[in-house]
Amino acid sequence: QARRRSAVGAVVRAGDARSFAPQIVVWAAGASRRMAPDDKLMLPLQGRPLLRHMAKRVLEISVPTLVALPPEPHPRWHAVKDLPLRKISYPESAEGLSGTLRAAVADLPPTVTHLCVVLADLPELAPVDFAQLFEHRRQYADCLIWRSLSPNGKPAHPTLFHRDTFPAFAQISG
């Protein structure tokens, strides 16, 4: 399929503009080295670990959700153990975010049309942020990547990827 750059810099293509079956992946597999010895995802926010706060926030959206976690046993597993989302650890996560991303994309069910990437350490994200991103996808359905913007117009999260981008994830590193 022919691809071109849109006026906003997103890669666009023709085809299946109406199909929308997203999967959210919450990235929580990192080592949290910069905060050592503390694990920032286990720090309390409103009386519960930040990771649990984020997972519950994402569950409000009613989209299938996967949380990528460090290998068990790890306290992060306990923080989300009773929540109705898929919890998984990928060996590739030892490589960093790119390894987790490669593994998660390869693990997506074939029915998933879009991947929504969410970092677990963004407590200010709210369901309205996802609603706006998904509406942006509807309005600009011929794009392949949709990225949220911060209030000052800088790229932010969450980010949404069309399935046509999934093969490229197999090549990422770093």
Model feature map: region roles:
Residues 4, 8-24, 166-174:
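Conserved alpha/beta core of the MobA/IspD/sugar-nucleotide pyrophosphorylase nucleotidyltransferase superfamily
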